[in-house]
């Protein structure tokens, strides 16, 4: 046996090598998705900068590939993961506050809206402390992935049939994605996720007994910390989207926190409680963001509530006499909390039809007409997928989404947009006002409702195609209410906030710039990447750069597919898993094609790839005279072409290159660059990433064309043998 391989972990030779490659590939994707989901929940920086964990995982995996001939010591990633858990999930309140303060430390101005954003400029010392904390967490993520990259690379490099081995790698990755998705579907907590992850990491160690007593105790401490992270909550559940905790309040009311931040309440406005508390009754009668909008509607026969949450908006609709209510909520656990805990039992009413779906997807497909449509304080504290830089509510607050809502209104129907606009982000309220004015050709009725007991405050914007809305709004009673409840910020006819569209859906970004917090964190990643790979990356070999740009282009292609198809099928976790499955299956099909032919000329394939990307960019998909699902299927089929071509190019180049570990490492590091290049969408829009991907692939093609006779990259094991 090669002594170098013996140090690397899993034995890559022998009859069980295929199974070992499958297990290592499964573990790599499983741990990657786990870190993306968990860090985005427990450390808010990783929730707001959605693909940060993904890029760090790629950096660690790629570095491991480059260093597969000199792998890290035993239990290297096991120790890194245990330290990461202990740092991030330590159940000490003061420590949690320090972690939350990291967001404020990195948020150097108000060009990007996050909760707990400071209104004053951030001190340099606070910024440096926050940057150091983020750097430490990123290093632990990278360290966790390094051995996994080394093991996968060494398995591939030892294989006699590289294309078959790569197919096994893809299949293991596919099962890893669905393995974690299954745990999310069952609402299992992180202690289960990490128990499986630690078991996988220990299983792949060459000498498990090296863990020792200290390692075993550390593992138990990690699991204990994960189990202790529930605090004082009545119930803690990990839904497919987020961590949800229920805290009991007074008068049969509850607070629901999402990813450790206050999110929503379950209010009690039953007649019995109002009769017992005259002060509360008077506050309620004076007006609130839930009940007051119904006073502006002429009819309430058919009501749509998107983002119905735990049922407060549904209860308000029932209190105000709605005949039928379609209540749309994306998170089944939040809906379950409302059904179980809401004192008014709104979801049990025969007038209510609950729909578990993405709000935008429902509106695009619905053919119903409504007297009132309410956007029920949708606000995302998390993301559905860290494979793109989208939040789950990104496509809900775009011009096209408001136009979908307008289409669903009856001739005299009323649209209500509620949003909690916080200082210093008045530009968000100005954006809503301006967009609605343009869509309805009339300024909306706008007012602000303060908090009433558990009913949260909100800026309220009311629009209609029918002028009777303004006749009602000018009645003495409603006119006085609007005058007494002005918005707490000025409304400008020319707001400096960019209108959001399906191509630029960044509600929480002020303008077409890369927010300073993103630039700060990207700078940290670039610096870490340079320091870690400068001695391993073969800068002077042309093939290295070819695979680098292939990786950059593919990451953009994959994330573009995830974000674009979310428009047609919804931003649900099932959709994301199906899209990733489709991507991996297309790549496996490309492997089969490469395996059937001895040599494929890559010039025409490169040309076809670039042309197909430009075609997807140019076609007016939203104008096709087809249903939403039909257009989505056509777009998915269109994306399969560049995916297939990209798969053929990579696999054929991989087969010819030699030095599987080195080229795979370069490819993964290119994906890191592609992840950072996603930030360009904040300036140029989502579609523009297709052009960037085409440029990356064109550069890779030119490198191949001009270095056709270049020597193959020397394998990592060959380098080790000659040393």
Question: What annotation goes with each model-predicted range?
Answer:
Residues 1-723:
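Alpha-helical transmembrane segments of multi-pass membrane proteins
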């Amino acid at each position: 046996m090669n002594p170098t391989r013996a140090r690397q972990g899993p034995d890559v030779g022998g009859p069980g090598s295929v199974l070992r490659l499958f297990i290592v590939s499964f573990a790599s994707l499983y741990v990657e998705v786990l870190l993306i989901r968990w860090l985005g929940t427990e450390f808010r920086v990783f929730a707001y900068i959605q693909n940060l964990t993904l890029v760090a995982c790629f950096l660690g995996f790629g570095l491991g590939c480059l260093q597969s001939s000199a792998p890290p010591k035993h239990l290297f990633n096991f120790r890194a993961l245990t330290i990461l858990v202990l740092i991030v999930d330590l159940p000490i309140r003061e420590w949690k506050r320090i972690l939350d303060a990291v967001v404020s430390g990195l948020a150097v101005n108000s060009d990007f809206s996050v909760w707990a954003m400071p209104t004053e400029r951030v001190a340099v010392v606070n910024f440096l402390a926050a940057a150091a904390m983020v750097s430490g967490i990123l290093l632990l993520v990278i360290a966790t992935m390094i051995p996994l990259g080394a093991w996968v690379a060494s398995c591939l490099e030892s294989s006699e049939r590289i294309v078959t081995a790569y197919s096994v790698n893809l299949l293991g990755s596919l099962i890893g994605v669905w393995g974690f998705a299954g745990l999310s579907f069952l609402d299992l907590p992180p202690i289960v996720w990490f128990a499986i992850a630690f078991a996988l990491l220990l299983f792949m160690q060459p000498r498990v007994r090296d863990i020792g007593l200290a390692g075993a105790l550390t593992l138990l401490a990690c699991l204990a910390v994960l189990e202790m992270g529930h605090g004082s909550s009545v119930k803690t559940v990990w839904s497919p989207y987020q961590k949800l905790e229920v805290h009991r309040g007074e008068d049969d009311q509850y607070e629901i926190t999402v990813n450790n931040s206050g999110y929503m309440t379950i209010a009690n406005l039953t007649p019995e409680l109002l009769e017992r508390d005259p002060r509360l009754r008077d506050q309620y009668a004076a007006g609130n963001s839930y009940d007051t909008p119904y006073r502006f509607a002429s009819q309430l026969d058919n009501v749509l509530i998107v983002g119905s949450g735990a049922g407060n908006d549904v209860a308000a609709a029932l209190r105000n006499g709605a005949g039928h209510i379609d209540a749309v909520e994306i998170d089944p656990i939040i809906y379950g909390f409302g059904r179980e805990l809401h004192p008014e039992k709104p979801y049990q009413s025969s007038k209510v039809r609950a729909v578990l779906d993405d709000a935008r997807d429902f509106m695009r497909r619905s053919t119903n007409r409504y007297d009132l449509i309410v956007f029920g304080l949708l606000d995302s504290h998390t993301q559905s997928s860290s494979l793109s830089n989208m939040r789950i509510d990104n496509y809900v607050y775009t011009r096209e989404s408001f136009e979908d809502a307008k289409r669903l209104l009856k001739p005299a129907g009323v649209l209500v947009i509620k949003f909690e606009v916080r200082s210093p982000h008045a530009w968000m309220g100005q954006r809503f006002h301006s967009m609605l004015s343009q869509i309805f050709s009339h300024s909306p009725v706008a007012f602000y409702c303060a908090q009433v007991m558990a009913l949260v405050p909100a800026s309220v914007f009311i629009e209609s195609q029918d002028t009777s809305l303004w006749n009602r709004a000018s009645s003495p009673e409603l006119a006085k209410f609007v005058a007494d409840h002005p918005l707490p910020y000025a409304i400008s006819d020319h707001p400096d906030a960019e209108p959001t569209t399906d191509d630029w859906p960044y509600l929480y970004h002020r303008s077409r710039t890369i927010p300073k917090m993103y630039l700060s964190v990207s700078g940290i990643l670039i610096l870490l990447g340079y320091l870690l790979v400068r001695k391993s990356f073969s800068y002077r070999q042309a093939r290295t750069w070819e695979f680098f740009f292939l990786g950059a282009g593919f990451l953009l292609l994959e994330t573009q597919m995830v974000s674009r198809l979310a428009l047609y099928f919804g931003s649900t976790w099932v959709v994301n898993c199906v899209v990733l499955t489709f991507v991996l299956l297309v790549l496996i099909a490309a492997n089969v094609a490469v395996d059937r032919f001895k040599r494929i000329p890559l010039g025409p394939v490169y040309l076809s790839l670039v042309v197909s990307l430009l075609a997807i960019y140019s076609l007016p998909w939203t104008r096709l005279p087809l249903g939403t699902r039909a257009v989505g299927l056509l777009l998915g089929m269109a994306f399969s072409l560049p995916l297939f071509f990209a798969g053929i190019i990579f696999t054929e180049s991989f087969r010819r290159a030699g030095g599987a570990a080195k080229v795979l490492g370069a490819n993964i590091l290119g994906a890191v660059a592609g992840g950072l290049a996603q930030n360009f969408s904040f300036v140029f829009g989502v579609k523009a990433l297709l052009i960037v991907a085409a440029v990356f692939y064109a550069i890779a093609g030119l490198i191949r064309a001009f270095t056709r006779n270049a020597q193959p990259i020397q394998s990592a094991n060959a380098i080790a043998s000659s040393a």
